[in-house]
A protein has these predicted regions:
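N-terminal membrane-anchoring alpha-helices
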Residues: 1-63
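A cross-domain feature marking catalytic cores of carbohydrate-active enzymes
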Residues: 78-80, 105-107, 129-131, 169-172, ...
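His/Asp/Glu-enriched short active-site or ligand-binding loop at hydrolase and phosphoryl-transfer sites
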Residues: 174, 180-215, 255-264
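Charged helix-capping and loop-helix junction motifs
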Residues: 145-150, 205-210, 236-243
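Acidic-and-aromatic substrate-binding clefts and catalytic sites of carbohydrate-active enzymes
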Residues: 81-85, 105-113, 136-144, 169-177, ...
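A short acidic, helix-capping loop that chelates divalent metal ions and anchors anionic groups
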Residues: 134-141, 229-233
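Active-site beta->alpha N-cap acidic-glycine motif
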Residues: 49-138, 152, 156, 256
Length: 264
């Protein structure tokens, strides 16, 4: 059941400011004052959209629930696939460590490699929505285009795998104020991350591991990539080496990786 959209306090304040600016102009306040306030407000909203972990534009899942923390669970999320050259290896490593993950997949990549998406589900992981095209201008899109990107991917994932995603992650984590009402209308939860390895830009597994493991704790949501991941000096996808060491470290710490849909 879809819930009625409730704007965040920031968006409510923004709407009030716009109304106040119009009222001020109507009673003769200087236009420059009203324009300055509106411009400053739009600057704040833009900055909020450029900050992936921001909650100013609406709900944004940064960590797992308290129950998941108490169960010593963490979530490994893997973005930008499926990639037939990388994803199968990632799945094998997860199997070897009896770990589960959530794969935020791009719709057009699922269309190109449906059998890889089906294998992700067959092995007990979840596939979540990462938009259809992973457009660089995603955060600049209007409501109709945003909705098309998301709905099309929901349909592709469902028709290909039989699984209906419950979570969405924006391309690069960027968004605008129009995204939150769309997600609520589709019963999707926005997810970002607690910490990321920057494995699309760094080819040194040790540096990536250090970023992921510093202050690592139960309830964390980690971000890695099977699509567009960097390659080591030996031309191996960096996520392969990172994931093996990360899962070994989690075991030593008594932490278990679960998919988002199975977290406590």
């Amino acid at each position: 059941m879809t819930s009625r959209w409730k704007p965040s306090p920031t968006l409510q304040a923004s709407a009030a400011l716009h109304l106040g600016a119009l009222a001020g102009i109507a009673v003769g306040l200087p236009m420059s004052w009203a324009a300055g306030a509106v411009i400053a407000n739009h600057g704040l909203l833009t900055a909020a959209g450029l900050w992936p972990r921001s909650t100013l534009l609406g709900s944004n899942m940064l960590r797992l629930s308290q129950a998941a923390c108490e169960a010593n669970q963490i979530a490994i999320t893997i973005d930008d696939g499926p990639n037939p050259e990388v994803t199968p290896g990632v799945l094998d490593i997860l199997d070897a460590w009896n770990a589960k993950a959530s794969f935020f997949c791009i719709g057009r990549h699922i269309e190109a490699h449906p059998y890889v998406a089906q294998e992700i589900i067959r092995r007990g992981h979840s596939i979540e929505n990462h938009s259809y095209g992973h457009r660089h201008h995603f955060s600049l899109m209007g409501m109709r285009s945003l909705r098309q990107e998301i709905v099309k991917t929901q349909e592709i994932i469902s028709q290909t795998t039989g699984y209906m995603p419950a979570y969405f992650r924006s391309p690069a984590g960027l968004r605008n104020p129009l995204l939150d009402p769309i997600l609520q209308s589709l019963d999707l939860k926005l997810v970002s991350w607690t910490r990321r390895g920057f494995d699309t830009m760094t080819n040194d597994p040790n540096k990536i591991l250090q970023r992921l493991q510093t202050d690592l704790a139960a309830g964390d949501i980690l971000l890695l990539h099977d699509g567009n991941c960097a390659r080591t000096v030996t031309d191996e996808p960096v996520v392969i080496g990172v994931l093996t060491q990360l899962l070994a470290s989690l075991k030593l710490k008594g932490l278990k990786s679960v998919s988002l849909n199975c977290a406590a």
